């Protein structure tokens, strides 16, 4: 059902492209797509042991560019400077576990493709089991991250106020080093990053608290107003999803349970199906009631005749 709905959306996107008569390139001459990303944000973007930039988002961007015949330029950026990089034209998009929620009006967004949660990671022997247990504790978070935004939101102001301290680190590798050393008691982080970091460390040494800080979704952020590039890239992602390539990549990087492409269409389809079933039930009940009334009327008429 999900892929059928995605196919319908893909057809509509392609039709819009045909109507406009425009083929969009990040760079009309060299046909490049310059993707800005945090180079220390596994499993979405990072440097592997061979010195290559890889990750779910970067590999997906690579496949999109292969389909379009473009060159992908992977550009590591200081996450705190991402808006400057985008608005100055140094990069074409921010594609790296980038949270939509709370930034809806700041970028031209793709559709959401991954569900995400902001969570807390603590040492297993810390005695911290709930968010309430973080009262009086030292918490670290990445600068300019969605986790920081979540902690500063009105929904979590009481939680954040309970901390002994909230310290911003330049990246999550530094944040986890602070947990390792005991300089911090907990790190607020995206669930995908948390799972990756725990998999790289001693088994059972760290745990993710059950209660999330915030639920959200990832999208690709383009410069405000750049709908044509957004639509071109998203159309290719839908094709890759239809071909099973997105799910394959997600499984490779262990984020398959976060995929949400087509979820809105599924919800609409389920709602339509429920409405249709309800209408059928109502029709059946009305038919049955009418039949019963007709039978009763006939019996009454027969009795009167006798």
How would you describe each model-predicted region?
Residues 1-28, 32-35, 64, 72-74, ...:
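Gram-positive cell-envelope targeting signals
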Residues 24-53, 66, 127-138, 202, ...:
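Immediate post-signal peptide segment of exported/extracytoplasmic ligand-binding proteins
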Residues 39, 115-122, 191, 195, ...:
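Periplasmic-binding protein-like
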Residues 39-42, 53-66, 98, 119-173, ...:
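Bilobed "Venus flytrap"/periplasmic-binding protein-like clamshell domains
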Residues 58, 62, 66, 71-133, ...:
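Acidic, polar ligand-binding/catalytic clefts
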Residues 58-67, 128, 132, 137-138, ...:
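Extended ligand-binding regions for polar small-molecule ligands
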Residues 71, 146-169, 202-208, 235-273:
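Ligand-binding clefts/hinges and TM-proximal coupling segments of bilobed small-molecule sensing domains
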Residues 81-84, 97-106, 150-154, 178-214:
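A ligand-binding cleft/hinge motif common to bilobed small-molecule-binding domains
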């Amino acid at each position: 059902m999900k892929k059928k709905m995605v196919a319908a959306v893909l057809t509509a996107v392609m039709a819009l492209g045909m109507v406009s008569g425009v083929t969009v390139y990040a760079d009309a001459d060299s046909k490049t797509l310059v993707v800005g990303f945090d180079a220390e944000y596994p499993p979405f973007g990072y440097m592997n042991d061979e010195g290559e930039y890889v990750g779910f988002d970067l590999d997906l961007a690579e496949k999109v560019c292969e389909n379009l015949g473009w060159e992908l330029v992977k550009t590591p950026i200081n996450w705190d400077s991402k808006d400057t990089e985008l608005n100055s034209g140094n990069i074409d998009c921010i594609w790296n576990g980038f949270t939509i929620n709370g930034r809806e009006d700041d970028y031209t967004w793709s559709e959401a493709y991954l569900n995400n949660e902001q969570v807390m990671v603590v040492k297993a022997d810390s005695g911290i089991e709930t968010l309430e247990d973080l009262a009086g504790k030292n918490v670290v978070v990445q600068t300019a991250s969605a986790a920081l935004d979540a902690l500063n939101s009105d929904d979590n102001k009481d939680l954040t106020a309970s901390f002994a301290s909230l310290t911003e680190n330049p990246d999550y590798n530094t944040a986890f080093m602070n947990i390792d050393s005991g300089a911090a008691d907990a790190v607020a982080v995206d669930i995908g990053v948390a799972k990756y970091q725990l998999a790289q460390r001693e088994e059972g040494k760290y745990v993710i608290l059950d209660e999330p800080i915030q639920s959200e979704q990832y999208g690709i952020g383009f410069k405000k107003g750049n709908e044509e590039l957004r639509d071109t890239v998203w159309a290719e992602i839908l094709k890759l999803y239809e071909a099973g390539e997105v799910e394959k990549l997600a499984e490779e990087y262990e984020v398959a349970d976060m995929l949400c492409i087509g979820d809105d269409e599924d919800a609409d389809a389920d709602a339509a199906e429920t409405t249709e079933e309800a209408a059928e039930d109502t029709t059946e009940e009305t038919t049955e009631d009418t039949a019963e009334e007709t039978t009763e009327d006939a019996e009454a008429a027969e009795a009167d005749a006798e």
